[in-house]
Amino acid sequence: MAIKTYKPYTPSRRYITGLSSEDITAKPSVRSLLVKLPAHAGRNSYGRITSRHKEAGAKKLYRIIDFKRRKFGIEGKVEAIEYDPYRNCRIALIAYKDGEKRYILQPRGLSVGDIVAAAESGLDIKPGNAMKLKNIPVGTIVHNVELKPGKGGQMIRSAGAYAQLMGKEEKYVILRLASGEMRQVLAECMASIGEVGNEEWANVTIGKAGRNRHRGIRPQTRGSAMNPVDHPHGGGEGKKNSGRHPVTPWGKPTKGAKTRRKKASDKLIISRRKGK
């Protein structure tokens, strides 16, 4: 997939880059798989901001994606590759032999006309197929990995993401994530074969503020530009610094300090991600 550049008809277009849409099939989406989601814009049920710098963005319809991949024993044919406004990878429309249609994440190398399937075991190791982790050979690249059997894929779903199956231990398998983290996952969990497509997404330059506004991202104001009542870095004359180590608006250390709480799943992490 190629990166597009634009002629600088306006100053803001000079540095914009985008992705070519040559891989997208020119046909409408399946209406039964579209649903309108309410725009929360970072607010909770009381209307209070719980996630800053968010807004509704451009109007869009959510595509219902099959993250579980538990339609066993029935082959499906890729009918279309489509754009999904809710994610940075493409999605593939699968038409199964029993007449049902579902969307899945498009792995790298999957194209219109290919045949995919899901089963507990016994499938070819090719992009788009899905099996239980215990039956996937060691060394295989996987994506859309479940954390709890039957719950649906929760890890490794964004454009260009992947994990490698490194080994098997009793009821667990060991995955190496792209970050370098080594993690145990239950062997009964499902995973899809291959790397998530649209890997060039990481090289796209947003280029102008309006493009982020369309995506639902509001501007971020520096704490040093605020008043002392609004941020620990606020106040002072001119561009005077705050005189303290960088912190969040609530006083937690930022810029490298670890603030993640311990979770029960920490015991499944064999080695932490490597710093980049």
Curated annotation (Swiss-Prot):
Gene3D superfamilies, per the entry: 2.30.30.30, Nucleic acid-binding proteins, Ribosomal protein L2, domain 3
Keywords in alphabetical order: Ribonucleoprotein, Ribosomal protein, RNA-binding, rRNA-binding
GO cellular component, one term: large ribosomal subunit
Annotated region described as Disordered, given as residue ranges: 210-276
One BP annotation, GO: cytoplasmic translation
UniProt biased composition (Basic residues): 255-276
Annotated Pfam families: Ribosomal_L2 (PF00181), Ribosomal_L2_C (PF03947)
MF terms (GO), sorted A to Z: rRNA binding; structural constituent of ribosome; transferase activity
Composition bias type Basic and acidic residues, residue spans: 230-240
Main function: One of the primary rRNA binding proteins. Required for association of the 30S and 50S subunits to form the 70S ribosome, for tRNA binding and peptide bond formation. It has been suggested to have peptidyltransferase activity; this is somewhat controversial. Makes several contacts with the 16S rRNA in the 70S ribosome.
Family affiliation: Belongs to the universal ribosomal protein uL2 family.
Name of the protein described by the UniProt record: Large ribosomal subunit protein uL2
